[in-house]
């Protein structure tokens, strides 16, 4: 899901509507109740920051806010956020997030103390999910760009009686859990990087994203059987895959080609790389609709510091020079020309206007 909804008037409004229609049709076809668990307890030590990792910002928005907004768009029964490191700060921030839809979201918090692995984190959330019907989706609070339609497809693949894993093939799977399939291509288990053999590390390129959809009743049973007999002495959520196979439950590896959707953040460098890749996609979306960007690698669309969600609406024949930053809700009229290194926030630029280089325009938070 894009952090900034790019609206190109007379072009993109129909496309946006079709995306929402598609998402609704997928969830209707899945025909199952949905609960979502978001894991947000990690310390994020490699960020070397006092700010919790899930509150680090991408496109002006906390990573966790991206994920909560994604969850909201799927219209679940309830969302449980698992916190741990700086729990008070994360929970307070999460409760104050500005979300794109007006639909109320039932969001609860549970704390993972101590932090003993991903399986242990989900175990803490289970008491908040009293119903045994439906599907439980597990998301990661530091994986911000998964599209809601992708998660909806995963729920559909689960079908209420299968275990569905979101996977992707990458050139360098170092550090990720690898998908182990049998000779017929059927998923058998996930092996974590530190527990993988040299042969598995060299040959398996398909990785588990950290996102899964599972039948609620089955998931609860598997979680109760987890142990920490591994190199890290942690309770791995990934161990439920082997349990599903042992129980005769089909395991579906829903493999996507877009690695950006499952990219996580563990360091400032990874955050910067993900930011730039995301901004390039936003720039490309504009250019595909006719907006002329002098250099798409030097374009930024972000939420503003007051929390106004990013939305850039462009009419026809708009030109944007290098290094421009747009924050909050901005409208550019027909033929508007934005000079280099301008910062425009919550403003409407008239048709035919010429904004000179290095201009800073702030229309306030109610544009």
Write out the residue ranges for each language-model feature:
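Extreme N-terminal basic, low-complexity initiation segments
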Residues: 2-6
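Low-acidity, Ser/Thr- and Arg-rich intrinsically disordered low-complexity segments
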Residues: 10-18, 22-25
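Conserved N-terminal catalytic core of the sugar/cofactor nucleotidyltransferase
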Residues: 21, 26-35, 62-139, 143-156
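Left-handed beta-helix
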Residues: 23-30, 232-367
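N-terminal nucleotide-binding beta1-loop-alpha1 segment
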Residues: 28-49
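Short glycine-enriched, charge-decorated loop/helix-capping segments at active-site entrances
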Residues: 51-57, 226-229
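Short aromatic/basic micro-patch
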Residues: 57, 145, 213, 264-265
């Amino acid at each position: 899901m894009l952090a900034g909804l790019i609206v190109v008037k007379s072009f993109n409004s129909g496309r946006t509507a079709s995306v929402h229609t598609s998402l609704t049709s997928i969830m209707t076809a899945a025909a199952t109740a949905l609960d979502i668990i978001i894991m947000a307890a990690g310390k994020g030590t490699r960020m070397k920051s006092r700010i919790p990792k899930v509150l680090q910002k991408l496109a002006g928005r906390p990573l966790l806010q991206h994920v909560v907004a994604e969850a909201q768009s799927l219209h679940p029964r309830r969302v449980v956020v698992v916190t741990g490191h700086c729990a008070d700060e994360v929970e307070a921030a999460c409760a104050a997030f500005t979300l794109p839809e007006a639909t109320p979201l039932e969001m609860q918090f549970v704390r993972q103390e101590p932090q003993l692995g991903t399986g242990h984190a989900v175990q803490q959330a289970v008491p908040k999910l009293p119903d045994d019907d439906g599907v439980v989706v597990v998301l990661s609070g530091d994986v911000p760009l998964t599209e809601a339609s992708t998660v909806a497809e995963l729920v559909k693949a689960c079908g209420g009686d299968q275990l569905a894993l979101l996977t992707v093939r990458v050139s360098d799977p170092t550090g990720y859990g690898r998908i182990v399939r049998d000779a017929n291509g059927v998923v058998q288990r996930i092996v974590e990087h530190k527990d993988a053999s040299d042969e598995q590390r060299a040959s398996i390129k398909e990785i588990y994203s950290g996102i899964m959809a599972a039948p609620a009743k089955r998931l609860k049973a598997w979680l109760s059987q987890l142990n920490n007999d591994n190199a890290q002495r942690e309770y791995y959520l990934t161990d439920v895959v082997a349990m599903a196979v042992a129980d005769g439950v089909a395991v579906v590896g829903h493999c996507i080609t877009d690695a950006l959707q499952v990219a996580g953040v563990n360091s400032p460098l990874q955050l910067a790389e993900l930011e730039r890749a995301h901004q390039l996609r936003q720039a490309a979306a504009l250019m595909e609709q006719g907006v002329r960007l002098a250099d798409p690698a030097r374009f930024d669309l972000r939420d503003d510091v007051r929390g106004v969600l990013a939305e850039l609406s462009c009419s026809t024949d708009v030109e944007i020079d290098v290094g421009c930053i747009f924050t909050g809700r901005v409208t550019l009229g027909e033929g508007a020309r934005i000079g280099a290194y301008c910062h425009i926030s919550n403003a409407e630029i008239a048709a035919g206007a010429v904004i000179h280089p290095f201009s800073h325009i702030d229309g306030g938070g109610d544009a």
